Design a protein with these regions (language model features):
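N-terminal topogenic module of multi-pass integral membrane proteins
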Residues: 1-41, 205, 209
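Membrane-helix boundary connector in multi-pass membrane proteins
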Residues: 38-42, 123-133, 142-155, 173-185
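Alpha-helical membrane segments in multi-pass integral membrane proteins
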Residues: 85-88, 101-146, 158-164
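Final/C-terminal transmembrane alpha-helix of multipass membrane proteins
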Residues: 190-208
Length: 209
């Protein structure tokens, strides 16, 4: 992940962009199949979480073939992007500071770490992004607020707090780019579709609490 991200910054070739998308398909697929279906099989509603991350993997697979996300650099949010990039490494440090050890501690390839890294990556290259991926990940981040109190996981407060401004910036960019299209039927239908997706994902994730 670090090597591919560095390659996107230094030499954003077509190969580098496709490799990052393949990596995202693998990473989200691993969370869906290995982490939730196998490792967390005893947890209630684990199948919903597996489907959730499986859908994100499919969205990246679709992006791989269509080239929808061009990974074009947007340098406006360097500070926030840097914070989001650091989060996956702060997660295990905070778990370790609380006296936890593997497998109880949060690692860099667990769902919350992957979510915050992906949000940071897409914010850094936010000229045009797959908004469905953003919606899914932002729902996950907001659910993290409740996990802080329900499951006593203070690490998730990092994810939730850092992604709130990212959510605002993503949708600010989206509406700025599409403001001139608001009278077109296609744009309005897409807005309603995104709202519907938000509601459905929110309901499904709330069932896992």
């Amino acid at each position: 992940g670090i090597l591919l991200t560095t390659q996107l910054y230094r030499k954003p070739t077509l190969w580098a962009k496709r490799s990052m998308k393949i990596y995202m398909v693998f990473l989200n697929g691993w969370i869906s199949i290995v982490y939730y279906m196998m490792y967390c099989g005893a947890r209630g509603h684990h199948h919903i979480l597996a489907i959730f991350w499986g859908v994100i993997a499919v969205l990246w697979l679709w992006d791989l073939f269509t080239g929808y996300t061009p990974f074009e650099r947007n340098p406006k949010y360097k500070v926030l992007v840097g914070v989001l990039y650091a989060m996956p490494f702060l997660y295990p440090l905070l778990s370790w500071a609380r006296g936890m050890e593997f497998p109880m501690m949060t690692t860099t390839v667990m769902p919350c770490s992957v979510a915050v890294f992906t949000i940071g990556l897409l914010l850094a290259f936010s000229r045009r992004v797959n908004l469905l991926v953003i919606l899914f990940l932002c729902h996950w981040a907001l659910i993290a607020f409740s996990k802080v109190y329900i499951y006593k996981i203070p690490e998730d407060l990092l994810l939730a707090s850092a992604t709130v401004p990212a959510i605002y910036l993503f949708f600010k960019n989206y509406f700025e780019q599409n403001l001139h299209k608001e009278t077109k039927l296609g744009a309005r239908l897409m807005n309603w579709f995104l709202i519907l997706i938000c509601i459905v994902v929110g309901v499904l994730l709330s069932m896992t609490l």
